[in-house]
């Protein structure tokens, strides 16, 4: 998987030597794998790896356990960690957005405060789901493009991997 991610990142020109890449780490398999893979590639790519965790506070103590896990993981790996959080339910009520949309907007607003590039752990499976959802919404050919590998400061190095590949590596 490491070689696939490296080749993908180079083909997509995701980073340049000297870049800081902040991995968005939820605590789930995809983002934890991404953190490990990018750490293993930092010398090869000449990049600096940091991490970020956004606590949505939607699952009570479970959300706090996710944050504690990410804190412990980053400490054990020696990776600087940026943390943030927000009241997703309050935003959704105020803006009449769905919880998912409110969470996404708060999370991406947090990402905007981070240094360098921000890596999210979207996979081939996520991309397929996005394409199918776009088709059902009637987006036409534009919807067939799916999740872009790089958009602005956001990079998606794991788009080359399936969820099954990621789970097999953990």
Regions found by a protein language model. Give the residues of each.
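Core alpha/beta nucleotide-donor-binding catalytic domains of modification enzymes
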Residues: 1-25, 29-169
């Amino acid at each position: 998987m490491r070689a696939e991610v490296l080749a993908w990142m180079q083909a997509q020109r995701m980073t340049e030597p000297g870049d800081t890449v902040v991995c968005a780490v939820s605590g789930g398999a995809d983002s934890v794998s991404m953190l490990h893979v990018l750490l293993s590639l930092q010398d090869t790519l000449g990049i600096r790896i940091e991490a970020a965790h956004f606590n949505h506070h939607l699952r009570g103590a479970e959300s706090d356990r996710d944050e504690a896990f990410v804190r412990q993981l980053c400490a054990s790996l020696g990776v600087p960690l940026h943390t943030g959080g927000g009241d997703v339910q309050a935003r959704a009520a105020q803006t009449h957005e769905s919880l998912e949309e409110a969470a996404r907007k708060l999370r991406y607003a947090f990402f905007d405060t981070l240094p360098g590039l921000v890596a999210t752990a979207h996979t081939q499976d996520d991309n397929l789901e996005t394409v199918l959802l776009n088709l059902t919404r009637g987006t036409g050919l534009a919807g067939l493009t799916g999740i872009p590998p790089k958009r602005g400061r956001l990079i998606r190095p794991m788009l080359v991997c399936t969820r099954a590949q990621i789970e097999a590596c953990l």
